[in-house]
Swiss-Prot record:
UniProt topological domain (Cytoplasmic) ranges: 1-291, 342-347, 393-470, 540-622
Positions on the Lumenal side per record topology: 313-320, 369-371, 492-518
EC number(s) from the headed UniProt entry: 2.3.1.225
Record-annotated DHHC domain positions: 426-476
Annotated family: Belongs to the DHHC palmitoyltransferase family. AKR/ZDHHC17 subfamily.
Gene knockout outcome: Knockdown of the expression in mice through ENU-induced stop codon in the gene or targeted knockout of the gene result is similar phenotypes. Mutant mice are normal at birth, but by postnatal day 7 appear smaller. They display generalized hypotrichosis and hair loss with altered skin that is loose with wrinkling and folding. Kyphosis and osteoporosisis are also observed. Finally, a generalized amyloid deposition results in early death.
Recorded name of the encoding gene: Zdhhc13
Alphabetical list of InterPro entries matching this protein: Ankyrin_rpt, Ankyrin_rpt-contain_sf, Palmitoyltrfase_DHHC
Record's comment describing the protein's domains: The DHHC domain is required for palmitoyltransferase activity.
Location in or out of the cell: Golgi apparatus membrane; Cytoplasmic vesicle membrane
Name of this protein: Palmitoyltransferase ZDHHC13
Subunit structure: Interacts (via ANK repeats) with CLIP3. Interacts (via ANK repeats) with DNAJC5 (via C-terminus). Interacts (via ANK repeats) with HTT. Interacts (via ANK repeats) with MAP6. Interacts (via ANK repeats) with SNAP23. Interacts (via ANK repeats) with SNAP25. May interact (via ANK repeats) with SPRED2.
């Protein structure tokens, strides 16, 4: 039963609605009238015993409403505005009153108001998901249309209530349902709502991209172009919308863009058309499949060319500088024209692999004669083999991507909604799944990752529950490889350069090693660069794992939160920090002669705390 709190309980009591960011597009004249009514604020009631039943319903004064109904008031009787009590209770999210009125014979789908809407329509306009759930559970029909011709899902889209959209579709509402004009929710979103959402959200439910409306024969892409909705156009093109379908006027989306003189959208459509046309050629398809390999070859050639120019037999550094600039210009053209945008994120990865390749070749060709048969030689070989193995394991191992079938997603959405948990803390609007504890959605991989640490651009993969331990050994082996090549460089200089640091001082020694072999100095600098960042990350990772029990994402999130808190937030006092030895045992999943036993947890399906349930709320906010 809802209490009669009178002040702030019903600030938004009328049957209007808010329009959250429609750009320049409105809905209708009636909508503005409803919106004006919604902004009215009822005066505070000091004595609720004398108020009428409409006002008592708006304020949620259950006892007063019950008293009047039991005295003979007909709950189906509309007021002067043709609005029923169920409408007023629905728009103000008075759950107990709705249950009471239904038990007293209220018509669940009674039409009323200026827009001839049902109580379900009113609840959706205001974004009251609990009320929507309650009305549907009592038999409300989501397919009914209001005076503007919109059904429930159309209204949820227009007012950008994503949880309600997800719930309606999961309960069986068709994502391709049309309004009186034959427009689907995707068409309305593309035309009425300027921005990427809810268009991107609807596309996750696999709506039809080729369906056309009754009047104009426009596809969703036509409507997005007509509205100048750049974000929606981008989403629809990414989803594979057709560029060739013509509307009733015989216009393609590109024709409409040219007619409206929207240069940005015209450029987007032309670029997409060119890319799709290129995919028809066998050579282009082959190049697309081999993009990463070609990028790796280009990177290896570029690194070799830089070293070759530096080692070129010329005393003119101006000439070498000009050659390096020309090389940089030429190599920048290949990724721009032949490598897709998605594969450009692998540039650091191919740079690392190319560096390791030339580090190995330098060791084998230049350093091998000075180290053959020594422990240094075998240590380097072991390090390079370990690096290749753990790089592959980090790359190939599933980091903990959370997966669910379409049916499982719908069941999860309904379950979360009906338990009051359908919010961004527990539900991923991109994957449409319930988020496990400590997970995060990676926008590069476009998937939720269990016990997410980071998306490492050096490996080109997410680091999570499945491959985090491989990542630690990857950093360790890379650090060892670079350490040995740095040591080998000093051995090479001591054997092949005519001077030493002790005899001639630093400046003369530096000049000599540059003149002795610019290539070795170049490889030394590459190794020093990779050694610096890999060692730093390794130390940072081991500190977080052993002393904090946190991932990189959790640590950064807690540090950000602490800036806005009055009291200092200790990173050590979290439910995941179980002490140095236990943290290491849990991370590497290994014990120590029975003294320490790891706690085996599958973070891909862990939704509640297992260590200290009282602290679950703290960690969910990380």
């Amino acid at each position: 039963m809802e209490g009669p709190g009178l002040g702030s309980q019903c600030r938004n009591h009328s049957h209007g609605s808010h329009v959250p960011g429609f750009g320049r597009h409105g809905i209708c004249v009636h909508e503005n009238k409803e919106l004006a009514k919604a902004k009215e604020i009822l005066p505070l009631i000091e004595d609720s015993s004398n108020c009428d039943i409409v006002k008592a319903t708006q304020y949620g004064i259950f006892e007063r409403c019950k008293e009047l109904v039991e005295a003979g008031y007909d709950v189906r009787q509309p007021d002067r505005e043709n609005v029923s009590l169920l409408h007023w209770a629905a728009i103000n999210n008075r759950l107990e009153l709705v249950k009471f009125y239904i038990s007293k014979g209220a018509v669940i789908d009674q039409l009323g108001g200026d827009l001839n809407s049902t109580p379900l329509h009113w609840a959706i306009r205001q974004g009251h998901l609990p009320m929507v759930i309650l009305l549907l559970q009592h038999g409300a029909d989501p397919t009914l249309i209001d005076g503007e011709g919109f059904s429930s899902i159309h209204l949820a889209v227009l007012f950008q209530h994503m949880p309600i959209i997800a719930y309606l579709i999961s309960k069986g509402q068709s994502v391709n349902m049309t309004d009186v004009n034959g427009q689907t929710p995707l068409m309305l979103s593309a035309y009425k709502v300027i921005g990427p959402e809810p268009t991107g959200f609807l596309l996750k439910f696999n709506p039809s991209l080729s369906v056309v409306d009754k009047t104009h024969q426009n596809t969703p892409l036509h409507w997005a172009v007509a509205a100048g909705n750049v974000s929606a156009v981008d989403k629809l093109l990414e989803a594979g919308s057709s560029l060739d379908i013509r509307n009733a006027k015989g216009e393609t989306p590109l024709d409409m863009a040219l007619q409206s003189k929207n240069q940005l959208i015209s450029h987007m459509l032309r670029t997409e058309a060119k890319m799709r046309a290129n995919k028809q050629f066998r050579l282009w398809r082959w190049l697309h499949k081999c993009e990463l390999f070609l990028l790796l070859i280009l990177s290896m050639i570029t690194l070799w060319a830089v070293g070759y120019i530096l080692d070129f037999n010329s005393d003119s550094w101006l000439l070498k500088g000009c050659l390096l600039v020309a090389l940089f210009f030429l190599t920048s053209l290949f990724p721009r024209f032949l490598v897709g945008y998605k594969n450009l994120v692998y540039l650091p990865t191919v740079f690392l692999l190319s560096s390791i390749f030339w580090i190995f070749m330098t060791w084998f060709i230049l350093f091998f004669p000075d180290t053959a048969g020594s422990p240094l030689y075998f240590a380097f070989i072991f390090s390079i083999m370990a690096f290749l193995y753990f790089f592959y394991k980090t790359w190939a191992t599933d980091p903990g991507f959370t997966k669910a079938s379409e049916e499982e997603r719908k069941v999860n959405i309904v379950t979360l909604a009906e338990t009051g948990s359908l919010d961004f803390r527990t539900f991923c609007t991109s994957c449409l799944i319930r988020k496990p504890l400590r997970s995060l959605h990676c926008h590069v991989c476009n998937s939720c990752v269990a016990r997410f640490d980071q998306h490492c651009f050096w490996t080109g993969r997410c680091i999570g529950f499945g491959n985090h331990h491989h990542y630690i050994f990857f950093l360790l082996s890379l650090s060892m490889v670079c350490d040995w090549i740095i040591y080998g460089s000093f051995v090479y200089w001591s054997n092949h350069c005519a001077t030493t640091f002790k005899e001639d001082g630093l400046w003369t020694y530096l000049n000599q090693i540059v003149a002795c072999s610019p290539w070795v100095l170049y490889i030394f600098m590459l190794a020093a660069f990779h050694f610096s960042w890999s060692t730093f990350l390794l130390i940072n990772q081991l500190f977080q794992i052993a002393f904090l029990g946190l991932t990189s994402h959790e640590r950064i999130s807690l540090l950000k939160q602490s800036r806005h808190m009055k009291q200092t937030l200790s990173l050590r006092k979290t439910p995941y920090n179980l002490g140095f030895t236990q943290n290491l045992a849990d991370f590497f999943q290994c014990g120590c002669f029975g003294l320490v036993k790891p706690c085996i947890i599958d973070w891909t399906s862990q939704y509640t705390m297992v260590f200290h349930p009282a602290k679950e709320k703290v960690l969910r906010s990380v």
